[in-house]
């Protein structure tokens, strides 16, 4: 299973959810066994610091029992919500990942093999904003159903509170967990990881100076 050694961390964070949220997650581990091709869909919370996909793929490759050949593609739009993304076009586009150019300027071509898993996040306030919450649930369900019909496991990435608005942690945790339970989808509790890290390791700054986006350490924590 992807990042087995990190599954223990997920379990501990889900236990923390009983402290920060009144909702218990129904799905606590991924259904996919060692997904080789992962699509990440989101916004600047994902693409800051050269992208969360880079530390994630390094973590996967550092876990020898997972083998080789993992690919992660990141599709982001700054400031976007789930409603901005045409997920169907992403998973059906045969040109995504179809080539690479190495350091010697050699073009390598690849066959499109599709995706095993798609990790999605909404805008930082959308799940808790009174004028966006319904759309969060609508598109969480729409995208999840589409992915499942195409044999791709959907995963929601719970985002974190703004540094100066810690009350967002509980609010976001509840809405993401409810959406996950409604759609039978795993939620990776990144927001809870931020909360726990700041309590346990206050000397590590997880935030960019704007108090919203991740620092390098925050991006690495999101990947883990």
Language model: regions and residue ranges:
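N-terminal secretory targeting modules
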Residues: 2-66, 70
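Conserved SGNH/GDSL esterase-like catalytic core that processes O-acyl groups on lipids
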Residues: 37, 47-133
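Generic structural motif recognizing short loop/turn segments at the entrances and edges of beta-strands
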Residues: 12, 34, 68-73, 78, ...
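Alpha-helical cap/lid subdomain in secreted, periplasmic
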Residues: 103-219
């Amino acid at each position: 299973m992807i990042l087995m050694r990190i599954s223990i961390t997920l379990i501990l964070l889900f236990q923390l959810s009983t402290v920060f949220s009144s909702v218990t997650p129904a799905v606590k581990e991924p259904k996919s066994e060692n997904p080789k091709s992962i699509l990440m869909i989101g916004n600047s919370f994902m693409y800051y610091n050269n992208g969360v996909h880079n530390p994630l793929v390094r973590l996967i490759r550092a876990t020898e029992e997972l083998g080789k050949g993992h690919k992660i593609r990141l599709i982001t739009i700054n400031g976007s919500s789930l409603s901005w993304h045409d997920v169907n076009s992403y998973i059906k586009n045969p040109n995504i990942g179809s080539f690479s150019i190495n350091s010697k300027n050699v073009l390598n071509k690849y066959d499109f093999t599709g995706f095993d898993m798609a990790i999605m996040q909404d805008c930082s306030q959308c799940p808790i904003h009174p004028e966006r919450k319904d759309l969060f649930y609508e598109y969480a369900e729409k995208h999840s159903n589409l992915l499942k019909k195409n044999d791709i496991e959907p995963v929601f990435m719970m985002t974190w509170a703004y540094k100066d608005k810690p009350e967002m942690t509980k609010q976001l945790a509840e809405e993401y967990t409810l959406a996950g339970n409604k759609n039978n989808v795993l939620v990776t509790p990144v927001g809870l990881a931020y909360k726990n890290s700041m309590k346990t390791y206050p000397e590590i700054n997880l935030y960019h100076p704007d108090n919203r986006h991740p620092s390098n350490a925050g991006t690495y924590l999101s990947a883990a």
